[in-house]
């Protein structure tokens, strides 16, 4: 540290260049730093989803969930397997150690899924991995409204147009759709007609599969041109399905699907519904953010894309957002920014009152933004996000401790010196810095040691508090580095030329109050000890009555209402009880 102090004063130009580089790196890191409201507590996990519309919960667990769990069991770094088996859906969650890279975890799961597919009958669904997102990935939600449009038309528009365009936004990993009616073509067979024509249900299935497909036949050359041969037999309308030939009757007369069944456009069997604003059922879209992305930037781009999509929608169809993560993030960041700004101004005011030197106060205060920029650079390199925990824990009083000691001692040495030559000033600044270098380093180092045990926390506690400790440690380390290099240099340039290190009026008042108290305490040493012990015991009693919370409560400004009903309640009943 002594050599660093000497070099910073000897090579002042290079020190100035280093300051500029630190500022540039800090500003760039701050501009690209992931900003969110709170730390992401989601563990490293991969979700495997399987849709099995024909199965109930018991069958889903037996034929789908169990084979997937058996295939995933024993994966490297696997910590826990969880599963939920519901009507028509299996969700298996594989949780890995926090040190596991999420992409490696997904690769391991993908390799084992090939084994699981072999154990699950084809008609029971095919397992797929869920989107690469976290618990904080739900960043933007909206409803799609259009007077005169059916729920089926709105869902189709959201699924095949709006959703696909939103998935193309950088940082968006998935767009989930709730509500509406999924479009299907239903073939409702008449058993009596089947019997009269001596047909089976299997013949109907086979006819639909054979005649609802594409086929390629290569190409032919005709008049110097190459013409592709294709068999286009995909059904796009109800009439296409109705005219599929099932078999041939007597005399070779074709028997069509329409002869034995009713073909119509209808909704798929629904297992859920969505309502909004008390206006009945609607269609809802939820944008999910890619894990590790900047919520502020992603949502901003999503809103820009929504404005573009709105211009292309059919007349009367409107996208109405009802949840926007940036509103909450902006409130949190605004609170943190105001607290930091007010704290910085308060520190500058206190420094001026105690030092009695505006230049000295500004020199000390310069350590605050520079330390923050160093912390931003470290956070960017460590992959930490700026949030209420990581930024709100920074104490400006701690950041200026070293600089206060350094500046005060430099002012004392300069005021005692009668020589105003640059060489003598440089020598006095160097000597003053060396006098306080060791105790200043120990003082800041001890504070850093207090935060080191927090870095050993694991699980949810670690995800919550490790970013806070890491940010504070980086800011304190940066403040110590600045106190050794930048503060002496600024003091050499701007601290004045001797004199002016007299006690301020505030210091004299405080000294007048403190001196009698000190004499009284030294004359009666047992009384201060007894008072301290009494206050300690009183604090223990008061502390036992305080409430305990894992994290502070955050008011996002939104209400989450959960309504519990009997498991057997019908979907139509839930729809009538919408709020």
Question: Across the structure, where does each feature detected by a protein language model lie?
Answer:
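Signature of alpha-helical transmembrane segments and their immediate interfacial
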Residues: 1-35, 434-436, 502-552
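Short helical (or helix-break) motifs at transmembrane helix termini and adjacent helical loops
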Residues: 8, 395-416, 440, 482, ...
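Residue-level signature of catalytic and energy-coupling elements of molecular machines
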Residues: 8, 48, 72, 109, ...
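Hydrophobic transmembrane alpha-helices and their membrane-interface caps
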Residues: 26-31, 47, 345-412, 456, ...
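Helix-loop junctions and hydrophobic alpha-helical segments within the transmembrane domains
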Residues: 322, 333, 407, 413-442, ...
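Conserved small/polar residues in nucleotide/adenosyl-binding loops
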Residues: 577-579
């Amino acid at each position: 540290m002594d050599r660093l102090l000497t070099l910073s004063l000897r090579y002042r130009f290079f020190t100035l260049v280093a300051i500029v580089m630190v500022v540039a790196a800090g500003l760039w890191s701050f501009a690209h730093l992931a900003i969110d409201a709170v730390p992401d507590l989601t563990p490293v996990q991969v979700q495997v989803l399987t849709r099995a519309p024909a199965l109930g919960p018991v069958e889903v667990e037996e034929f789908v969930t169990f084979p997937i769990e058996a295939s995933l069991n024993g994966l490297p770094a696997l910590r826990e397997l969880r599963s939920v088996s519901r009507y028509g859906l299996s969700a298996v969650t594989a949780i890995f150690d926090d040190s596991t890279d999420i992409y490696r975890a997904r690769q391991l799961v993908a390799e084992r899924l090939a084994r699981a597919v072999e154990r699950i009958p084809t008609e029971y669904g095919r397992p797929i991995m869920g989107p690469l997102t976290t618990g904080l990935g739900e960043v933007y939600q909206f409803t799609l409204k259009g007077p005169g449009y059916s729920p089926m038309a709105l869902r189709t528009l959201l699924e095949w147009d709006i959703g696909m365009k939103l998935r193309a936004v950088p940082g968006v990993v998935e767009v989930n759709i709730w509500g509406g009616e999924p479009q299907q073509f239903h073939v409702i067979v008449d058993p009596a007609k089947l019997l009269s024509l001596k047909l089976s249900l299997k013949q109907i299935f086979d006819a639909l599969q054979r005649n609802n497909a594409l086929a390629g036949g290569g190409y032919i050359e005709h008049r110097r041109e190459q013409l592709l041969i294709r068999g286009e037999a995909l059904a796009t309308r109800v009439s296409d399905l109705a005219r599929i030939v099932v078999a041939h009757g007597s005399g070779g007369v074709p028997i069509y699907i329409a002869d034995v069944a009713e073909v119509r456009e209808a909704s798929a069997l629904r297992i859920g519904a969505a309502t909004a604003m008390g206006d009945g059922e609607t269609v809802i879209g939820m944008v999910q953010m890619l894990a590790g992305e900047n919520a502020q930037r992603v949502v901003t781009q999503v809103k820009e894309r929504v404005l573009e999509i709105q211009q292309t929608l059919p007349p009367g169809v409107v996208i109405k957002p009802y949840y926007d993560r940036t509103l909450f993030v902006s409130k949190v960041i605004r609170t943190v920014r105001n607290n930091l700004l007010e704290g910085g101004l308060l520190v500058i005011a206190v420094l001026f009152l105690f030092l009695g030197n505006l230049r000295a106060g500004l020199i000390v205060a310069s350590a605050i933004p520079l330390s923050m920029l160093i912390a931003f650079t470290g956070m960017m390199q460590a992959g930490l996000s700026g949030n209420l925990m990581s930024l709100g824990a920074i104490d400006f009083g701690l950041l200026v401790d070293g600089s206060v000691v350094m500046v005060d001692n430099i002012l004392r040495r300069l005021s005692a010196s009668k020589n105003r030559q640059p060489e003598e000033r440089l020598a006095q600044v160097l000597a003053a810095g060396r006098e306080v270098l060791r105790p200043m380093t120990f003082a800041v180092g001890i504070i850093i040691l207090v935060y080191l045990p927090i870095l050993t926390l694991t699980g949810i506690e670690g995800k919550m508090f490790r970013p806070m400790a890491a940010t504070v440690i980086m800011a304190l380390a940066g403040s110590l580095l600045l106190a050794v290099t930048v503060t002496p240099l600024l003091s050499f340039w701007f601290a004045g030329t001797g004199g002016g290190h007299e006690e301020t009026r505030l210091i004299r008042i405080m000294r007048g109050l403190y001196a009698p108290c000190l004499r009284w305490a030294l004359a009666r040493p047992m009384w201060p000890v007894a008072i301290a012990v009494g206050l300690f015991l009183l604090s223990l009693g008061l502390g036992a009555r305080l409430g305990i919370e894992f994290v502070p409560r955050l008011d996002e400004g939104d209400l989450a209402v959960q309504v519990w009903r009997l498991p057997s309640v019908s979907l139509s009943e839930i729809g009538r009880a919408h709020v």
